[in-house]
Amino acid sequence: ISPLTGTNGEIR
């Protein structure tokens, strides 16, 4: 989990 991608691995 990343702050830029949220719970998924895609950047929105």
Curated annotation (Swiss-Prot):
Broad enzyme group: oxidoreductase
Cofactor: heme b; Ca(2+)
Cofactor binding description: Binds 1 heme b (iron(II)-protoporphyrin IX) group per subunit. Binds 2 calcium ions per subunit.
Keyword terms, alphabetized: Calcium, Heme, Hydrogen peroxide, Iron, Metal-binding, Oxidoreductase, Peroxidase, Secreted
GO BP annotations listed: hydrogen peroxide catabolic process
Highest taxon of source: Eukaryota
Catalytic activity: 2 a phenolic donor + H2O2 = 2 a phenolic radical donor + 2 H2O
One GO molecular-function entry: metal ion binding
EC assignment: 1.11.1.7
A single cellular component GO annotation: extracellular region
Disulfide bonds: none
Localization per Swiss-Prot or TrEMBL: Secreted
Role played: Removal of H(2)O(2), oxidation of toxic reductants, biosynthesis and degradation of lignin, suberization, auxin catabolism, response to environmental stresses such as wounding, pathogen attack and oxidative stress. These functions might be dependent on each isozyme/isoform in each plant tissue.
Family: Belongs to the peroxidase family. Classical plant (class III) peroxidase subfamily.
Name recorded for this polypeptide: Peroxidase 2
Organism: Vitis vinifera
